[in-house]
Amino acid sequence: MGGVTVRDVDAQKFIVAYAAFLKRQGKLPIPGWVDTVKTSASNELPPQDADWYYVRAAAVARHIYLRKTVGVGRLRKVHGSTKNRGSRPAHHVDASGAVDRKVLQSLEKIGVLEQDEEKGGRRITQSGQRDLDRIAKTTVDEEEEDDE
């Protein structure tokens, strides 16, 4: 099989694999408030998963890989959800901008993303693309081993 890219891998499996890679690597800077903050105004409680920041970073990296340039506003819309307003009609609420902004800044610090001066927003770097493709390849290899 030729070059395997992120597009060729199931999204959920890739995000879990890349989040595990980021945690194992230990270079991703994590803010001190991640264990207490909610990720959106539509949520009642903070995330139950202790490693949710790594999962969000992996999801953001994959999202930007697939779409070239993405800003904080677009990520807020993507990670937002429906707010339960009781007996009133539900409405979409964007996710926390601070969380997505800090994730982008963390990925920038480890060299996965860079700022796009012309269009605005962030784009994937060559080293970041190489890392993501390598993780995608290992994910496909693990799937093939499981099939045998």
Swiss-Prot record:
Entry-linked InterPro entries: Ribosomal_eS19 (IPR001266), Ribosomal_eS19_CS (IPR018277), WH-like_DNA-bd_sf (IPR036388), WH_DNA-bd_sf (IPR036390)
SUPFAM superfamilies named among the record's database cross-references: Winged helix' DNA-binding domain (SSF46785)
Keyword field: Ribonucleoprotein, Ribosomal protein
Composition skew (Basic residues), residue ranges: 79-90
Amino acid composition bias (Basic and acidic residues), ranges on this chain: 130-140
One GO BP annotation of this record: translation
Domain of life: Eukaryota
GO molecular function: RNA binding; structural constituent of ribosome
GO terms under cellular component: cytosolic small ribosomal subunit
Keyword Ribosomal protein in annotation: yes
Region (Disordered): 79-98, 116-148
Family per record: Belongs to the eukaryotic ribosomal protein eS19 family.
Record-linked PANTHER family: 40S RIBOSOMAL PROTEIN S19
Protein name: Small ribosomal subunit protein eS19
Gene source species: Emericella nidulans (strain FGSC A4 / ATCC 38163 / CBS 112.46 / NRRL 194 / M139)
Gene behind this protein: rps19
